Amino acid sequence: MTSKLKVNILADGGDNAILTSDGSGSLTLNNDAFKNTPSFQAYLGSNSSNLTMGTATKIEYNTESWDVGGCYNNTGSTVNLNGLSATAYSFCPNVAGKYWIYATARVDASSNFPHDAYFAIYKNGSAVNIFQRVAQSTDFNGTLRLGAAVDMNGTGDLIQIYVTLYDGVNAFISNYSSSTLFGAYRLIGT
């Protein structure tokens, strides 16, 4: 024995469509609670400023791959996004929730000396998640990776990515679009 429930619209008690079907198997989620948005991904389109020992440097991810919801500022100045003030190279979502924040950065040095590096997610100007890389050889050139779930209030919290080098020579962030990335998406159900 089999049962079928055939509907074109699944609605809540207020008759708001949560899910619709076009009758051919294509479904559309109409409720934002079921979507991983806002979301974005950006990469470094050109070499950033040189990294100086002991100085936290904001990475200028200036080229967007996508920006669903218009919440990433890929410019060098403060702008208004969805009614919120977003500082340079920051993600400032206008929807509250937990977000998966991820970043990578390709660090290259002109000479081969060991480096220690701190790669950090900054929320509202303070580090909330830090990854430390200690070079085990004389060649530091490599990609730093970082990811964390971060609570965002949807009314002005913003995220930026910084890198700080210690114990070595100055270096720079390379503009490899596949290895110098910054992105975020809202986690469903949070």
PLM features: residue spans?
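A short, structured loop/turn motif at beta-sheet edges
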Residues: 94-96, 122-127, 151-158
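Short, surface-exposed beta-strand/strand-loop-strand elements in extracellular ectodomains
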Residues: 112-126
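Terminal (often C-terminal
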Residues: 15, 22-113, 131-134, 169-190
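Short proline/glycine- and polar residue-rich coil/turn motifs
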Residues: 135-142, 151-153
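Solvent-exposed beta-strand/loop surfaces of large extracellular or lumenal domains
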Residues: 123-139
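Residues that act as N-cap/strand-start positions at coil-to-secondary-structure junctions
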Residues: 4, 13-15, 85-87, 115, ...
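Extracellular beta-strand-rich recognition modules
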Residues: 97-107, 143-147, 157-164
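Short, intrinsically disordered N-terminal pre-domain segments
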Residues: 1-16, 188-190
